């Protein structure tokens, strides 16, 4: 299932942003397969037999990049060039001037040059950025977001969207760079790879993917038995200690009846080699493919339904370093995703199971002429740039 913006809806969003005096940009987030990495004509990585490394790719117009990164960054992302995030570059030892071979929608080879290595924010905490113009050779891709820059009035954008039938909060969401930290926010792909390891994969029919056997042998603990609450699942070794800590605390607090062990052991668990159910033509591996997420109580908490997970259980998992899917768009109440940092001490107006700590006051920034507002799922505040994102309901399972 792919939830993206139709061309018609994206056009209405752009019209609203323009009417509000700002500049709209269509943004795409395909996951593109990398099959080779070269330096001075020598292969550093070369994959065959349809194996590929998933590269989380941000695609946006050059004028968007100019608004948030300046002229020098646009020059580095010229035709046939990509910007690579610093974490992704670290993972593969990439340098400026290296060549990477990406595969288009028909799995044909397309070669790009690394024009610059940039802070992760400029690749949306993924792997690479390329301009819309450069990405045309990859083939058609779904519209993920409409981003606004050069904003003078946030409220005016909301008003103009509403007048065109774009209601924020039901089918669509708005994200801004001044948003408070979300306790259920997930890791960017490059951070996920650094924590859990990067793998190669190839399609295995339908939503299934085959993942590199060496990566699985190194990282997945097969049929691991947890104590206190007797789950037995295939999970990533990095997440196992935190899962055990959460389960032990749930048991110690007398909440074990809220974990359906039989259901979790048969229908839930961590590792599944598959695409994200929300992936499009350029499919992204699920967080479960990394063994980084745990599903429990699946019958009562199926995707899109109002979550029925016990809130004390939710907060315990947050304490042990998990984001909860009950506040994803759409809700995925069975899903706990390891992020590696405590999340129960973050005040945020969560729709379901908010933490029991004060919610900080959010101050709307002052918009000067030329300020930038973009819409993104994971955005960070900057002293020079203000950003906001309009996007359809999506998930990162």
Task: Locate predicted features.
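Membrane-proximal extracellular/periplasmic loop immediately following the first transmembrane helix
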Residues: 1-38
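Second-shell loop/turn segments in exported
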Residues: 2-3, 78-79, 146, 225-237, ...
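Basic-flanked hydrophobic alpha-helices used for secretion and membrane insertion
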Residues: 9, 32-178
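Short amphipathic alpha-helices in soluble, non-transmembrane regions
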Residues: 10-17, 157-165, 308-318
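N-terminal low-complexity, Pro/Thr-rich disordered segments
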Residues: 167-192, 357-397
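Active-site acidic/histidine clusters and adjacent loop/turn architecture
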Residues: 195-262
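Active-site-adjacent loop/helix surface patches within enzyme catalytic domains
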Residues: 247-289
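Catalytic cores and adjacent binding grooves of peptidoglycan-active enzymes
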Residues: 279-374, 394-397
């Amino acid at each position: 299932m792919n939830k993206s913006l139709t061309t018609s809806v994206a056009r209405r969003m752009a019209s609203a942003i323009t009417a509000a005096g700002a500049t709209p940009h269509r943004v795409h987030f395909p996951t593109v397969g990398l099959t080779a990495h070269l330096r001075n004509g020598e292969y550093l990585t070369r994959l065959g037999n349809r194996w590929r490394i998933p590269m989380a790719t941000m695609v946006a117009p050059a004028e968007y990049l100019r608004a948030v990164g300046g002229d020098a960054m646009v020059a580095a992302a010229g035709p046939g060039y990509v910007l690579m995030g610093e974490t992704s570059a670290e993972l593969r030892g990439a340098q400026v001037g290296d060549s990477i071979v990406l595969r288009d929608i028909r799995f044909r080879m397309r070669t790009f040059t690394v024009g610059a290595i940039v802070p992760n924010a400029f690749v949306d905490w993924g792997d690479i950025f390329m301009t819309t113009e450069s990405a045309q050779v990859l083939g058609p891709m779904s519209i993920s977001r409409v981003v606004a820059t050069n904003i003078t009035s946030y409220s005016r954008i909301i008003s103009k969207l509403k007048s065109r039938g774009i209601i924020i909060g039901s089918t669509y969401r708005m994200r801004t760079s001044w948003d408070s930290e979300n306790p259920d926010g997930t890791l960017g792909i490059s951070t996920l790879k650094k924590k859990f390891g990067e793998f190669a994969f190839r399609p295995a029919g339908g939503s299934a993917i085959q993942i590199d056997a060496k990566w699985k042998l190194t990282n997945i603990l097969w049929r691991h038995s947890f104590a206190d609450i007797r789950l037995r699942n295939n999970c990533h070794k990095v997440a196992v200690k935190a899962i055990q800590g959460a389960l032990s605390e749930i048991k110690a607090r007398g909440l074990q009846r809220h974990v359906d062990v039989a259901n979790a052991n048969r229908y839930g668990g961590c590792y599944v080699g598959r695409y994200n159910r929300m992936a499009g033509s350029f499919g992204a591996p699920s967080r479960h493919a990394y063994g980084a997420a745990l599903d429990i109580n699946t019958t009562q908490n199926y995707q899109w339904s109002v979550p029925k997970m016990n809130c004390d259980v939710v907060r315990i998992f947050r304490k042990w370093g998990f984001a909860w899917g009950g506040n994803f768009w759409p809700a995925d109440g069975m899903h706990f995703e390891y992020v590696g940092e405590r999340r129960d001490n973050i005040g945020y107006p969560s729709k379901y199971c908010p933490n029991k700590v004060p919610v900080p006051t959010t101050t709307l920034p002052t918009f000067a002429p030329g300020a930038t507002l973009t819409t993104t799922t994971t955005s960070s505040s900057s002293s020079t740039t203000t950003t906001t994102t309009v996007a359809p309901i999506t998930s990162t399972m």
